[in-house]
């Protein structure tokens, strides 16, 4: 009888302390900046699968800045004609076929960080600002991404060309609501500010930045 009680208590304790694991995986930014391609992303996914990283919790493969090709006449995002000539769906399908989840990048303002810091002109006017529902539908209903990192260079007047200064809580909340409106409840959103955003972030995101950029070195 005592053994049965011990087992019951163990099961109860396990359920009480159950939690969602952190978002672990790989992102293209620190190593490649905007110099990415569909072939590079799929090659990385293959390597992670081959080396068993998914089995130890590294489940996300995230396409960061550099895939943008501007917007068409209707405001729809298009991909870079050389880096992603076949669009994003083929790459996302490849990631999913390997059992991973696929992540993407955008900005809460008009322009991406790569457009400012890496002089990538195709990162201008591709952020969420003015396109919240349109971009959310594209990323999560049409393409099928599972994660999104949302930067704020386009909303920070010091880091964008039009000196657009936006309220970060308002912008991230609006994007969060646009994602929910797609019907997807499983999307993980990351708020990419360069310090702790504030307690409001608990209501809109699964994870967030707490510091300045790191770099691909052990010292960092």
Residue map of PLM features:
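Sec-dependent signal peptide recognition
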Residues: 2-9
């Amino acid at each position: 009888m005592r053994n049965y009680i011990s087992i019951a208590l163990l099961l109860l304790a396990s359920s009480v302390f159950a939690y969602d694991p952190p978002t672990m995986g790989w992102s293209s930014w620190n190593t490649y900046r905007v110099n990415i391609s569909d072939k590079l992303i799929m090659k990385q996914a293959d390597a992670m699968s081959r080396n068993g990283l998914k089995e130890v919790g590294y489940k996300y493969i995230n396409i960061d800045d550099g895939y943008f090709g501007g917007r068409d006449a209707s405001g729809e995002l298009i991909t870079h004609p050389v880096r992603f000539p076949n669009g994003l769906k083929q790459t996302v399908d490849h990631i999913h076929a390997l059992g991973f989840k696929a992540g993407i990048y955008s900005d809460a303002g008009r322009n991406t960080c790569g457009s400012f810091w890496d002089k990538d002109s195709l990162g201008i006017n591709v952020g969420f600002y003015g396109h919240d529902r349109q971009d959310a539908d594209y990323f999560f209903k049409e393409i099928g991404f599972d994660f999104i990192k949302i930067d704020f260079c386009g909303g920070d007047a010091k880091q964008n060309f039009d000196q657009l200064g936006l309220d970060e809580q308002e912008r991230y909340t609006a994007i969060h609501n646009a994602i929910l409106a797609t019907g997807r409840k499983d999307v993980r959103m990351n708020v990419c500010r360069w310090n702790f955003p504030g307690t409001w972030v608990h209501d809109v995101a699964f994870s967030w930045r707490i510091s300045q950029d790191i770099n691909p070195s052990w010292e960092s």
